[in-house]
Amino acid sequence: MIVTTTQSIQGHEIREYKGLVSGEVIFGLNFVKDIFASVRDFIGGRSNTYEKAMIDGREQAQREMEQRARAMGANAIVGVSYGYETVGPNGSMLLISISGTAVVIE
């Protein structure tokens, strides 16, 4: 499945628009890991805990979106965008969302 942020796919013609598809993931991080990540962030280092969680979450949300597109009969998704938001008490959870338009290409 081709997934792109652009509205078209070079070398392919869009034959049919199937509709909007999305994938969402929400998760909280371990309390102890949060403390160490906060300390690392405070002293200026990178938080590998949060970076890995964001990468894993983004990949999971994209897989979910692709599955939904396949179920609609699509073989590509165009106009993809990601969103990130902290939710829950004290921003303790991260919501990652992805959406795009499911299409059939030649």
Predicted regions and their residues:
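Short, well-ordered alpha-helical segments
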Residues: 21, 31-81
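N-terminal presequence-like segments and the immediate start of the first folded domain
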Residues: 1-33, 71-75, 86-88, 92-106
